[in-house]
């Protein structure tokens, strides 16, 4: 498979806004969802925009993507959905279309937690809504279970993950043995991955981010597996419910792209939990 950034990394970047740096509200960044979720349930609606240039043995070009995101955080779980649309240029020819739908669920494990540490398990999946013959989708379902942790020390947060990804298809039935498929967010048919992100608060509303992601093929299902390592740095800004994230990513190995920029904007709606024994809101009208 082409040396490219994985779908898991794309989901990770997009979902930072589900729980962007808000220590005051007890929310943390995680991969791909919130680790220590909000004290109160909340809904996050946003949009992710990314742009990258790439070069491989078959194609030279660039792509731009826009993806609406919807996330829900609860003290017992966090969930999200993301559906990208792309403009993709391949050797001077331009195409447009949807990418693969991404879904994710994360659950914290109370026995793993203390005052500064939270951890748990998650499961992400992509569904083949993008056309594989247009290099916009994988053409099959991909499942991505993971273990995650979040360590919070006042102005510094560390977020890490260890995961596994497996396509629900065989090598012969997939497009992975024909070169770069898809260009926008390919993965090995079977791989292990890990990520580590650090966040430093430099202002009450501003955090700086530095992170790395790596993945390596495992098993004999991969016809042309490829190891890749990607680093990124960026900034997170929060103003009340509005959250803004900007990041620049570059490959160390695997050459997924020459460079990629990611911009995310979202708004968080915190939902107050109803007190036990309280009457329903409509009761006073009777």
Show the residue positions of the predicted features.
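Bacterial N-terminal signal peptides that target proteins for export
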Residues: 1-11
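N-terminal export signals
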Residues: 13-15
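Transmembrane beta-barrel domains of Gram-negative outer membranes and organellar outer membranes
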Residues: 26-286
């Amino acid at each position: 498979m082409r040396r490219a950034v994985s779908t898991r990394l794309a989901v990770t970047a997009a979902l930072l806004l589900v729980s962007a740096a808000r220590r005051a509200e007890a929310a943390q960044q995680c991969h791909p969802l919130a680790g220590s979720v909000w004290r109160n349930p909340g809904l996050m609606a946003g949009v992710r925009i990314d742009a990258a240039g790439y070069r491989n043995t078959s194609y030279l070009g660039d792509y731009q993507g826009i993806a609406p995101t919807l996330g829900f955080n609860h003290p017992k779980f966090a969930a999200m959905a993301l559906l990208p649309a792309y403009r993709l240029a391949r050797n001077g020819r331009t195409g447009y279309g949807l990418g693969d739908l991404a879904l994710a669920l994360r659950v914290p494990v109370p026995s793993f937690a203390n005052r500064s540490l939270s951890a748990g398990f998650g499961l992400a999946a992509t569904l083949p809504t993008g056309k594989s013959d247009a290099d916009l989708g994988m053409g099959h379902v991909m499942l991505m279970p993971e273990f995650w942790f979040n360590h919070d020390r006042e102005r510094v947060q560390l977020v890490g993950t260890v995961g596994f990804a497996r396509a629900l298809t065989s090598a012969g039935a997939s497009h992975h043995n024909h070169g770069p498929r898809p260009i926008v967010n390919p993965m090995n048919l079977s791989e292990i991955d890990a990520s580590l992100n650090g966040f430093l608060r430099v202002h009450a509303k501003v955090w700086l981010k530095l992170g790395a992601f790596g993945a390596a093929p495992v098993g004999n299902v991969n016809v042309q597996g490829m190891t890749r390592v990607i680093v990124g740095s960026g900034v997170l800004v929060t103003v009340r419910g509005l959250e803004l994230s900007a990041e620049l990513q570059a490959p160390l190995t695997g050459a997924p792209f020459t460079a990629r920029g990611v911009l995310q904007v979202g708004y968080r709606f915190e939902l107050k939990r109803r007190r036990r024994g309280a009457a329903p809101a409509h009761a006073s009208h009777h």
